[in-house]
């Protein structure tokens, strides 16, 4: 109990104060440990997504900046969307989730023939149709990861991957 009855025994008061200080210090250490673990988990997730994105870009012959640019643009668009309208009340963590998931938008390109993927110049209509399948290929790849199907990142990444070339105009 937190109450000490009168008359006060100074030894009991002293022990209670020390125990309270120790508990507070332990709680702070635990909070710091959990915070560090969450940070490490987030860092590792972003690192793995960056590695996958780099693999796709390397195979595609892109500079390595495409995914970073998409990530930055997604973040900027989401911030403006939240500022301009109440229609999409996205929290900071939701915006970061969407931004992270956007890094996987072109993962389906790994399933496209290199001759088409790295062709200099314009694609033929047939090649264009094949290239357009990268959205379906990527979405299927993500959908096949059934053990992660309920994860928010996977759900958002699937939607972005599948529909990022659709035009709503």
Regions found by a protein language model. Name each.
Residues 32-47:
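Short, charged amphipathic alpha-helical "coupling" segments at sensory-output junctions
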Residues 7, 20, 24, 110, ...:
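Residues at alpha-helix boundaries and the short loops/turns that link adjacent helices
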Residues 43-169:
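Histidine- and acidic-residue-rich, metal-dependent catalytic cores
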Residues 7-17:
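C-terminal output helix
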Residues 18-36:
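The C-terminal output helix
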Residues 4:
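Conserved Rossmann-like nucleotide-binding pocket used by diverse enzymes
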């Amino acid at each position: 109990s937190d109450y000490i009855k009168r008359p006060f025994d100074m030894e009991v008061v002293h022990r209670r104060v020390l125990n309270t200080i120790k508990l507070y210090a332990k709680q702070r250490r635990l909070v710091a440990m959990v915070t560090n673990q969450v940070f490490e988990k987030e860092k590792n997730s972003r690192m793995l997504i960056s590695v996958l994105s780099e693999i796709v870009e390397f195979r595609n012959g892109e500079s390595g900046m495409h995914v970073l640019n998409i990530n930055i643009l997604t973040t900027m668009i989401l911030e403006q969307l939240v500022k301009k309208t109440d229609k999409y009340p996205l929290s900071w963590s939701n915006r970061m989730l969407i931004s992270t998931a956007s890094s996987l938008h072109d993962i389906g390109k790994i399933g496209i023939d290199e001759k088409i993927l790295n062709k200099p110049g314009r694609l033929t209509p047939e090649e264009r149709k094949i290239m357009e399948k990268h959205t379906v290929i990527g979405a299927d790849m993500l959908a096949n990861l059934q053990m992660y199907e309920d994860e928010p990142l996977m759900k958002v990444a699937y939607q972005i991957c599948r529909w990022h070339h659709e035009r709503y105009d």
